[in-house]
Amino acid sequence: VKNKSVGIYLTNHQINVNILKTLDKEKNDFDYVYVKLHPHIKKTEDLYQYGLKIVQSNIMVEFLILILLDNGNKLSVFHENSTSVIWFQDRIINKNMGQPFEEYDIVASYIQSKEL
C-alpha cells in the first residue's frame, strides 16, 4: 500500500466493538482499513461482518506503522492508550479511543517533548 489513506485499529487483549462500529461508519474516508489484532486474539470470525482487513500476525505493530508511513501513506491509528503509537505522534492521526489514563498521558507528553 503506497500513498493512500489508511485507517488501522490496534486491538488490546480484547476487541472493542465500539471502535469497530466507528471504523465501519468511517471506512469510506479511507482507501484501506485494517484491524491489527493483539497476538493473544485468535477468534476472528466476528470481525468479518465489518468488511475490514484483518492483520493477524505476531509482528510488532511499530514495524507495521513504520512500513505504512515510509510508503507515503496518511495513517489514522485507532487505539486504546497504546504506547506503540507514541513514537509516531508527529506522523500519524492519533485516534485514542481509550478511557483517560494519566500515566499514558504523562509518557506521551514526555516523549513528544523530546527530539528523538
What is each PLM-predicted segment?
Residues K4-Y9, F30-V35, N73-F78, I92-M97:
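Hydrophobic beta-strand segments of well-ordered beta-sheets in folded domains
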Residues I15-I19, I41-L47, E102-V107:
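Short, charged/polar "capping" segments at the starts of alpha-helices
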Residues S84-L116:
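Catalytic binding pocket for nucleotide-activated donors in carbohydrate/polymer assembly enzymes
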Residues K21-D29, I67-N71:
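Short, basic/hydrophobic alpha-helical segments
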Residues H40-Q89:
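Donor nucleotide-activated moiety binding/catalytic core segment of transferases
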Residues K25-L37, Q49-I59, R91-K95, E115-L116:
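Structural alpha-beta junctions
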Residues V1-L23, D31-I41:
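Active-site donor-nucleotide binding/catalytic segment of nucleotide-sugar enzymes
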Residues K2-K4, I67-L75, A108-E115:
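Short, surface-exposed amphipathic charged segments that create phosphate/polyanion-binding patches used
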